């Protein structure tokens, strides 16, 4: 992130004018590295300090902490709330113009679910959630675009909102109890800068649920965009979504260093003038994935290969005449 900051051309955007903070959510793998641990004590008592520690990757979905054993009611999303409030405090940061929460991969998953159930903080400074290349998303409806019967847990939290409290959640429980319409309304009220690496076709799903929304990160992203389209009703307002398509693999450094990354993380609204860059990355992939279109590029054609092949076939972005069908020629077309 700091290396990316150093690449910004505007010399006013630097380490003296931009505060960068990376929160640390330790888990059991961090014993005696992130927090002290004493072997031989009763189960759950080995962590002997007030350090907040989470179970596995549950921090990424807002679950309560696992340690210390006598205080286990702190959600990782409460931590994000407090960080936002801290940087929004004008007595500490009188010149704060914008707050960006940035998450790549599992961090992106964290922020997408935070967008869905996160509290309305009523900040003075605009807040943007930069969400990039998550492996799965919490769906805002009971519908899934792909096969559901083979996955009875498809709608459990973190991919849906069933079994929410059972996951270890107290944060957002009252909102989730109101139902999906309330969750979606809360999600839609958040300002999200989506970032998608177009070379990222990875899949690290550990359950069947993500596969009901696509076979890999690429499919899952575009299915989510199709069903829950971002919007930018007022580019100078505080609820304008953007979607940036970046020619990169699953690499946070390349995402941060891209022109899109530099804009969303550092230069958008830097001077408090409500300015923001248009969506990056043309041609676009599907209808609805361009909430803040660049008027000079919006009509960029998708097909760049104009050759005619055997049988009069022309290239339209993917081959769909393969037999038998392969992963490169899916029966369900996304875009």
Model segments located where?
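The feature captures the conserved acid-bearing segment of alpha/beta-hydrolase catalytic domains
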Residues: 124-234
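Short, surface-exposed "cap/lid" segments of acyl-processing enzymes
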Residues: 1-15, 22-38, 201-206, 210-214
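Short glycine-enriched nucleophile-adjacent loop
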Residues: 108-120
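C-terminal catalytic histidine-bearing segment of alpha/beta-hydrolase fold enzymes
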Residues: 195, 209, 229-334
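Phosphate/oxyanion-binding active-site loops and adjacent basic polyanion-contact surfaces
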Residues: 69-81, 216-221, 254-262
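Gly/Ala-rich beta-loop-alpha elbow adjacent to hydrolase catalytic centers
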Residues: 103-107
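Residue in the alpha/beta-hydrolase core beta-strand immediately N-terminal to the catalytic nucleophile
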Residues: 98-100, 128
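Alpha/beta-hydrolase active-site loop
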Residues: 43-92
